[in-house]
Amino acid sequence: MKSKIEIFTSYIEESNIERIKSMNLLPIFVIRSMGRLEFIEKWAGTPLHFRELAPSKELFREYRAGNIDQVTYFKRFVIELAGVDFQNIILRLENLIDSSGADGICLCGLGENPEESHRSIVSDILWRTGYLEFEPKEV
C-alpha cells in the first residue's frame, strides 16, 4: 500500500522555516551539519534531522569549492544514497506526522533554487520508489 503522507521541499532560512511550520508542515532537515545555523541547531541530532539524506561532507565541500560541477555532484550524491532504505525513511516520516499532528512534512535543504539543491534529488527518489501516493512538491 502506498503512503498517503504529503511531502514538500523547501530551503533553510529562518523566516521560511516559520512559514513551513505555519502551514502545519513538519520541517525535516536533510543536511549533515546544523551547528553553524543558530536558528536550527536545536534540532541537530533529533528525529527531525535526517542527515543520511544529505551529501557527505567531503562531496559537499568539493562541490562548494568548485572542484566538481553540478552534474558530477548529483551523480555522486545518488551513488551515496544507494545504501539508504527509503521504505524505512517513509515509515519514520509517517511516525513523525502521526505523533506531531502535522499535515505533512517538508524536506529542508540549503539553497533557494530547488534545481541546485540535493533536496530535489531526495524527493525525486522518494517519488520514484513507488511508495508514495502523492508526488512531492516545492513550497
What does each model-identified segment do?
Residues 2-139:
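Residues lining hydrophobic/aromatic ligand-binding pockets adjacent to catalytic sites
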